[in-house]
């Protein structure tokens, strides 16, 4: 039953979200990650209401990088699909040269969240009750909820480690197969 009166937590047993930054700085301010920063109040409500949510934040997504080495493999396919993927990704990599030149590639933010939704073993998590700061200088910061630190039940997991080789290998295999078939 997906009636409007039911919440996500009632319909889905486990949720995975891409957003936040717990152990690293944000990407739109020293504290806030872009997705959470768009609506900190909504994200805070999600963290307080859902019982099993996994946060895939910058802590791990910036460890899963695509570089020009990967895009060269798509270009080498000689297919329109490979050329498109390479051009689009190279554009994204170039944007990172301005915003985060130290990374040497572009983060796979949303793809990693999808990967974890399919295979939670891709990441190492810590259990925590989360909140989002909704006011002041730290607005948009994802952090442990000090009012629930001692609660026995932890309602969130935050990814703090990622099996990047396994994730990148599967990501590249799937997209390369698609790009090769797109003629």
What residue spans do the PLM features occupy?
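Aspartyl protease active-site motif detector
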Residues: 6, 46, 114
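Short, well-ordered, mixed-charge alpha-helical segments that flank or form enzyme active sites
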Residues: 6, 22-28, 62-66
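Short coil/turn connectors at secondary-structure junctions
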Residues: 10-14, 50-51, 126-128
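Short, conserved beta-strand edge motifs with alternating hydrophobic and charged residues
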Residues: 17-18, 54-58
């Amino acid at each position: 039953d997906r009636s409007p009166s039911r919440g996500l937590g009632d319909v889905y047993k486990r949720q995975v979200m891409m957003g936040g930054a717990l152990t690293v700085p944000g990407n739109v301010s020293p504290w806030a990650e872009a997705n959470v920063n768009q609506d900190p109040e909504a994200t805070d409500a999600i963290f307080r209401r859902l019982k099993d949510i996994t946060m895939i934040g910058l802590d791990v997504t910036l460890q899963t990088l695509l570089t020009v080495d990967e895009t060269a493999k798509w270009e080498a396919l000689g297919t329109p699909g490979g050329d498109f993927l390479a051009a689009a990704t190279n554009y994204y990599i170039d944007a990172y040269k301005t915003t985060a030149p130290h990374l040497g590639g572009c983060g796979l933010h949303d793809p990693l969240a999808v990967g974890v939704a399919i295979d939670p073993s891709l990441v190492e998590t810590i259990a925590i009750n989360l909140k989002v700061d909704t006011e002041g200088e730290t607005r948009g910061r994802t952090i442990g909820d000090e009012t629930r630190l001692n609660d026995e039940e932890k309602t969130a997991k935050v990814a703090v480690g990622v099996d990047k080789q396994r994730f990148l290998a599967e990501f590249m295999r799937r997209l390369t197969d698609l790009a090769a078939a797109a003629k």
